[in-house]
C-alpha cells in the first residue's frame, strides 16, 4: 500500500503486545540489504520476574547522534527522516556511533567491517511498502500505517516520540505506545534507570534494561 504526503505512515512500537515469537527477527534477516543479519533486537525485560519481551528497532532520531559523531560522514539521513546504515566506502569501523547512540542500536558487524542497523527497510518503505518486521508481526507490537488508524485501533494508549535522557530530550521518527491516561510529554529514560519500579511501564523498563550495563560500567 502506498501513501501520499499528507497521510504519511507512522512506525509505532507497542511493547506490551510483544509475544516473543521472533517473527520480526527472522523477517529482518530476509531483507535484501541486511546480508542475512537481523537488525532488530528482541529484548527480555527483567528476566527474574517476567517472561515479557519487547522488540527494539532504530528509533531514527530527528537529530541522530550516531551521524553527528561519525568522523567519516558515513551515516546519512534521508529527507523523510530515516537514518541509514553506514556507507561501506566511508565507514572506518571506529564504533563512535555504537557508543553514542542513546538507544544502543548500532552494531559493528566485524565480518563486514561495517556498522549496520535498522534502516526501516528503506528499500521497501521508500516505495510505499511496510518494513518486513511490521508485515509479519502477528500481535501488532510493530505497526506501520496511517496515524489515524493507530488512534482508532488502540483506544487505551497513545504514541509518543520524545525520550528524556537527563537534561536532553531526544525526538524520534519511531514512536512507542504509552497509556492514554499518562499525560507526560516524554518518556523519562534516566528516571527508569534509577527507579526501575516493579510492574512499571514496559517502554521504560526495556530501555532501562538496554542501557543499564553501559551505566554500570561508566
Segment roles from a protein language model:
Residues 1-218:
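Non-ligating segments of multi-cofactor redox enzymes
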